[in-house]
Amino acid sequence: MFSFNMFDHPIPRVFQNRFSTQYRCFSVSMLAGPNDRSDVEKGGKIIMPPSALDQLSRLNITYPMLFKLTNKNSDRMTHCGVLEFVADEGICYLPHWMMQNLLLEEGGLVQVESVNLQVATYSKFQPQSPDFLDITNPKAVLENALRNFACLTTGDVIAINYNEKIYELRVMETKPDKAVSIIECDMNVDFDAPLGYKEPERQVQHEESTEGEADHSGYAGELGFRAFSGSGNRLDGKKKGVEPSPSPIKPGDIKRGIPNYEFKLGKITFIRNSRPLVKKVEEDEAGGRFVAFSGEGQSLRKKGRKP
């Protein structure tokens, strides 16, 4: 018998227009080349060899090209897209966070299969650190970061880069399926409380209970207005020689008025107090009547009276 696998790298297999093969995976930092490929770490896409593109072009693969990655040793799986086909044969390059989700080490085997995923309508994320709350607009930051992703899988911990800092988010829920495509989709995003977040404790003021309740019935009289209750001041700044000691005010000395319970809105009533006239005032008015020519005349030059 002859073995048809005479090459070091596995040959892709086709089952009913489905791409399926195994690659040895490495992190993007081990990708040889003059250009810095740190942009691959910021997304959810992998780099595959040119032979994969040749096989995919012969199949009736719907775009965008989405793949299911499976680590059979740990029974872990995730989904991703493809960025380029420039890797060496038999090798694929993955972002570091994706290798952590799959529990893969450098050079580990991963099963790659082409899949079709439904378009996402809802997703829920849980930040893995309370530092994520320092971001002013987290939804806008996440929307910008997800442009480098092709799909989401429930249970994955994705990594996004913002202001030169890496934030990890766990995908708690996706709809309509556990794995969804987020390319050209209208998706509602929600956040769960960050891992390790504690709500600030409210300071409750414990008031000491008294043996008996205080009687506040006498306070109403003290709150009434009392005219000229202050102390006077002189212009020269001196104080009076004898200052009378103010007598304490009792609640009964100041009486409050009784409200008019028959008051009607929009009606004004002028209340006047009737006071009896004093008899002395009447006598003064009677005695002080006007009498014409009752005074004495005066002249500028004194003249003697004729005998």
Swiss-Prot record:
Lineage top rank: taxon: Eukaryota
UniProt GO MF annotations: cysteine-type deubiquitinase activity; K48-linked polyubiquitin modification-dependent protein binding; polyubiquitin modification-dependent protein binding
InterPro entries, per database record: Ufd1-like (IPR004854), Ufd1-like_Nn (IPR042299), UFD1_N1 (IPR055417), UFD1_N2 (IPR055418)
Coiled-coil regions listed in the entry: none
Pathway as given in its UniProt record: Protein degradation; proteasomal ubiquitin-dependent pathway
Subcellular location: Nucleus; Cytoplasm, Cytosol
Positions of modified residues (N-acetylmethionine): M1
GO biological process, one term: ubiquitin-dependent protein catabolic process
Keywords: Acetylation, Cytoplasm, Nucleus, Phosphoprotein, Ubl conjugation pathway
Residues bearing the modification Phosphoserine: S129, S231, S245, S247, S299
Family, similarity comment: Belongs to the UFD1 family.
Protein name: Ubiquitin recognition factor in ER-associated degradation protein 1
Organism name: Homo sapiens (Human)
Designated gene of the protein: UFD1
